[in-house]
């Protein structure tokens, strides 16, 4: 009987803990300038959003749940300019293996000088400069 109670308690804790975690959002914004197109390619483990294009002032959101493993790591390759000559690679999300980050919003904004990163209410910070 005590084993049954222990099993039910462990099962309840597992399901309640996992259900409370909200999705994490990676927001990608194109603020390069009028008539400038941003190309991005984001991937994580077996998830691959493919090559996507974003017009000026466009916004895309990638939503996912952190499973607490390295498979939750998201990397994005950005390209812009004539013939997509300028590029940079960004680690958009790195999981905290001890404490999953639930409901966070990570914003990546493409500007002419660099990709800027913003989290929560903090001001945007330059993350990676464009390379050619």
UniProtKB/Swiss-Prot annotation:
Belongs to the plant self-incompatibility (S1) protein family. GO terms for biological process: rejection of self pollen. Keywords: Secreted, Self-incompatibility, Signal. Residues 1-20 form the signal peptide. This is S-protein homolog 15. It comes from Arabidopsis thaliana (Mouse-ear cress). It comes from the Eukaryota. Its main location: secreted. One of its GO terms (cellular component) is extracellular region. It is found in: Secreted.
């Amino acid at each position: 009987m005590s084993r049954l109670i222990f099993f039910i308690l462990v099962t309840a804790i597992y399901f309640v803990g996992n259900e409370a975690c909200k999705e994490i959002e990676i927001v990608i914004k194109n603020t390069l300038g009028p008539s400038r197109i941003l190309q991005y390619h984001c991937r994580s483990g077996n998830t691959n959003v493919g090559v996507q294009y974003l017009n000026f002032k466009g916004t895309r959101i990638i939503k996912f749940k952190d499973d607490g493993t390295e498979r939750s790591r998201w990397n994005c390759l950005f390209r812009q300019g004539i013939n997509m000559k300028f590029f940079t690679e960004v680690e958009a999300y790195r999981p905290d293996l001890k404490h999953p980050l639930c409901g966070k919003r990570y914003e990546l904004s493409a500007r002419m000088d660099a990709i800027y990163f913003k989290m929560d209410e903090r001001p945007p910070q330059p993350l990676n400069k464009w390379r050619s």
